[in-house]
């Protein structure tokens, strides 16, 4: 992954997401994943927080915050793959509302790249009275990957999304930054089953082959 500090100009184009870590992109792997008997150590889960904001200047009419289906709150590969997609939806909601609440509920504190991203983009924008126009994330596809147990992950998925063109507006409504649309980009997302639910423990831009 390309090395950047998370600045507001980073925002959520694919380049923004790619710029939220300092390590190399995950290499694509087309091998068939196998079930693992690996048992990671037990860690404290993320604390509960307040409900997410449901309105904002970048929220579409009638749109509600994304939710992870209760029926998929189980420890299996299919549920993990859906949760990886849900992580991207929480980031999309952050760009709709400049609220990091939903995203913060989705990852464990050890995901420092997650923390850096939501703090530098959503929290930073909100503190300055800024908001976004466009930049919304659309799901394209996902695929289960072999688990390398990175940060004691339970499962790994690659999620491909597209990102609309984005503008950042100051509190007076003036455009102060913009970024082009990204038709397609893939992220590798490591998730862990902990405390009877899923959490993100790391994410990187994936180099597909």
Predicted regions and their residues:
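Juxtamembrane and targeting peptides
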Residues: 3-4, 8-10, 14-16, 20-82
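Exposed beta-sheet edge and beta->alpha loop/turn motif
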Residues: 24-33, 146-209
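A short, amphipathic edge element
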Residues: 126-146
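Short, intrinsically disordered, low-complexity terminal/loop segments
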Residues: 1-3, 208-209
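Core segments of small alpha/beta cavity-forming domains
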Residues: 57-132
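Short hydrophobic/aromatic segments of transmembrane alpha-helices and their interfaces
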Residues: 8-9, 86, 181-182
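N-terminal short leaders/motifs
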Residues: 90-97, 140-157
């Amino acid at each position: 992954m390309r090395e950047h500090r998370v600045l507001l100009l980073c925002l959520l184009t694919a380049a923004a997401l790619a710029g939220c870590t300092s390590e190399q992109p995950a290499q694509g792997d087309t091998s068939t994943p196998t079930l693992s008997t690996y048992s990671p150590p037990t860690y404290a889960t993320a604390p509960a927080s307040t409900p997410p904001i449901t309105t904002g200047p970048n929220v579409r009419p009638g749109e509600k915050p994304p939710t992870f289906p209760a029926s998929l709150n189980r420890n299996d590969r299919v549920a993990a793959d859906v949760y990886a997609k849900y992580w991207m939806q929480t980031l999309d909601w952050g760009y709709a509302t400049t609220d990091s609440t939903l995203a913060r509920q989705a990852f464990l504190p050890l995901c420092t790249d997650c923390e850096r991203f939501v703090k530098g983009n959503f929290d930073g924008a909100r503190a300055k009275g800024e908001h976004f126009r466009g930049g919304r994330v659309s799901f394209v596809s996902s695929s289960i990957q072999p688990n390398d147990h990175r940060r004691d992950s339970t499962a790994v998925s690659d999620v491909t999304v597209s990102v609309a063109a984005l503008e950042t507006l100051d509190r007076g409504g003036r455009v102060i930054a913009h970024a082009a649309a990204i038709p397609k980009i893939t992220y590798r997302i490591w998730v862990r089953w902990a405390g009877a639910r899923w959490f993100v423990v790391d994410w990187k831009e994936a180099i597909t082959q």
